[in-house]
Design a protein with these regions (language model features):
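Conserved active-site and cofactor/substrate-binding residues in soluble primary-metabolism enzymes
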Residues: 13-16, 44, 48, 71, ...
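Positively charged, low-complexity intrinsically disordered leader regions
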Residues: 1-37
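Alpha-helix C-terminal capping segments
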Residues: 48-60
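Short, conserved beta-strand segments within well-ordered enzyme catalytic domains
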Residues: 39, 54, 62-64
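Short catalytic helix/loop segments, enriched in acidic residues and glycine
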Residues: 31-51
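Conserved N-terminal subdomain of the carbohydrate kinase-like
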Residues: 60-111
Length: 111
């Protein structure tokens, strides 16, 4: 078995990130329990690398992940596009109401 690597000139991307991308709600300096306004951020280890390489070095990056086709999924997609990362490899799945949202509280923040 041999590994065939194409030249860079034949590749669409410098990097494709594979992994989960999350939405983080940040209450700022206030406590999460009493906050009524939040700043929303996108994030996830693999995605952070793709966005960083795009912003710092101008590399062509994309993400391969799956999102529920609902308002939250589309909001995260918009954040990704604002970061200059390609979203054409996102798989959109219908939201059937059975998905679960996971929250972790740490020092007043939701991750």
């Amino acid at each position: 078995m041999s590994l065939s690597i194409r030249p860079q000139s034949e590749c669409k991307y410098d990097l494709i990130s594979l992994g989960e991308i999350m939405l983080r709600l940040d209450p700022g300096e206030g406590r999460i329990r009493t906050a009524r306004d939040f700043k929303a951020w996108e994030g996830g280890g693999e995605y952070n690398v793709a966005r960083g390489l795009r912003r710092c070095f101008g590399l062509t990056t994309g993400v391969a992940t799956a999102f529920a086709d609902n308002e939250i999924g589309r909001l995260i997609e918009d954040f990704i596009l604002q970061g200059g990362v390609d979203t054409s490899l996102i798989k959109w799945v219908p939201y059937d109401g059975l998905g679960r949202e996971h929250f972790q509280f740490l020092k007043g923040l939701i991750f």
